Swiss-Prot record:
GO biological process: rolling circle single-stranded viral DNA replication
Name of the protein in question: Replication enhancer protein
Superkingdom in the source lineage: Viruses
Homology family: Belongs to the geminiviridae replication enhancer protein family.
Source organism per UniProt: Tomato golden mosaic virus (strain Yellow vein) (TGMV)
The organism's taxonomic lineage, starting at the top: Viruses, Monodnaviria, Shotokuvirae, Cressdnaviricota, Repensiviricetes
Pfam families: Gemini_AL3 (PF01407)
Length: 132
C-alpha cells in the first residue's frame, strides 16, 4: 500500500523494473537493531532495505523502505555477519534474475530467508510513489 495516499499498489507498479546492470549499487542494506530475548535460543535481526536514488528515479518512487524482522535460531552470527550473508543472498538472486523491482526484491528476501535456522520473517514496508 502506498504510505502517502493509502491506495493499494497496482500490479504494473509492483512489477515495473529496470535491468540491474544499468544502476550501480541499487540497494542499501542497513541493520537497525539486534535483539536477544532472555531465556530463548533466538536472535531477532531488524533489517532495512532502501532503494538507491537512481533506482527510485527509474521506478518513479518517492520513497521505498522495506523493513524486515528476521527471527533466527542461529545465535553465533553477529549483526554485521548476518547482514553480509543476507545482502549476498539477496543480490545473488537479483543478479540471476537480471531485473530489479519491488516484487523481485521481496522474492529475493524470501529466497535469502528460506533457511533451516530462520523461524519467522515479519515485513513492514514504507513505499511512496511520485504524484507527478
Amino acid at each position: 500500500m502506498d504510505s502517502r495516499t493509502g491506495e493499494p499498489i497496482t500490479v504494473p507498479q509492483a512489477e515495473n523494473g529496470v535491468y540491474i546492470w544499468e544502476i550501480t549499487n541499487p540497494l542499501y542494506f542497513k541493520i537497525i537493531s539486534v535483539e536477544d530475548p532472555l531465556y530463548t535460543n533466538t536472535r531477532i535481526y531488524h533489517l532495512q532495505i532502501r532503494f538507491n536514488h537512481n533506482l527510485r528515479r527509474a521506478l518513479d518512487l518517492h520513497k521505498a523502505f522495506l523493513n524486515f524482522q528476521v527471527w533466527t535460531t542461529s545465535t553465533t552470527a553477529s549483526g554485521r555477519t548476518y547482514l553480509n550473508r543476507f545482502k549476498y543472498l539477496v543480490m545473488l538472486y537479483l543478479e540471476q534474475l537480471g531485473v530489479i523491482c519491488i516484487n523481485n526484491v521481496i522474492r529475493a528476501v524470501r529466497f535469502a530467508t528460506d533457511r533451516s535456522y530462520i523461524t519467522h520473517v515479519l515485513e513492514n514496508h514504507s513505499i511512496k510513489y511520485k504524484f507527478y
